[in-house]
Amino acid sequence: MSDTQNLEQLLEALMDAEDPKEVRRIAGSILTLDGSHPAGHLALWELMEEEESLNSLGQLEKALEETRKRVGGAPASLYDENPLTEIYGALLMHLAFGFHAKEELERALAFAQDLVAFDDEGVYPGRTVFYRCLLDLKQYDRILEALEEDPLETPVGEHARTLALLETKGVCDETMEALLNALSLDTNLPFLILDLTILPEEDEELGAELEETFHQAVYLQTPWTETQERASFLALPTLILGSLTGRLEQEDQEALEEMLKDSGLEDGVARLQAQAAERDADEDPDERDQWAMEELMKLLLPEGN
């Protein structure tokens, strides 16, 4: 068997390997045959503990440079048949999140921007770190410009839009409309951001969908809670939504009642709560959320929006 054929078999085996010892063995064999192969270096980096991995981002930068050299810049698309296509996306993802963790925001943003440009379907969580970097850098106009060009409408993007509008235009109908649109895209997300959701025990599975939402919440929590104005702006519609969908603990319900005082919304919320109480207790949660969001929009937005 030629070295090329052997290398191809090792790369296939690496994709299927799950045991860390097996991954390390296969990656070592790949690098014995091809000392600069990005797949081998990426696999070994992913086995590192967090501190070591952050101190070894230079290893990933070299692997990315080698990947770009081998594919002629960047893969044509997510579905480019070149075996390095997935490696390219993974390297950009790790570099963006890694440099953000090290608070090297401009470097993180550069890798995140490349990942978003490459991934127009949201396969990688690049938009999460991309918009978080822009929020950290307080580049609010750039957030709004990026959203105009982004082919995807995502919860994290719409939360970033809301925060950008809140900073550039303040509390207004446009900002509230943006927030309600963000909530409608993932109704669980604001509860995680505000720590209003009881998560499963550590040994229980979150489920793929909730895991993705949790990851987004981790990156949105700091921007949303940076000021009291931001936190309050998110909290009121979130608490109303929670009261209509059975998500609130007693103390959260009391917090809502306090926020409703002098808001002019008490009667409207009480009416909706009465309607919610009359709905089928076994109603599908997604249908309940859809009803609640429709009513929330009617309550908080002027007619015609």
Residue ranges, per PLM feature:
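Long, ordered, amphipathic alpha-helical scaffolds
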Residues: 164-305
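TPR/TPR-like (Sel1-like) alpha-helical repeat modules
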Residues: 52-69, 116-120, 135, 148-155, ...
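Flexible helix-coil transition and linker loops at the boundaries of alpha-helical arrays
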Residues: 30-33, 60-85, 116-118
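Structural motif corresponding to the intra-repeat A-B loop/turn of tetratricopeptide repeats
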Residues: 17, 50-51, 102, 137, ...
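TPR alpha-solenoid repeat register
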Residues: 40, 91, 124-126, 157, ...
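Structural register within alpha-helical repeat arrays
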Residues: 10-13, 44, 88, 95, ...
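Residue-level signature for tetratricopeptide repeat
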Residues: 12-16, 30, 47, 98, ...
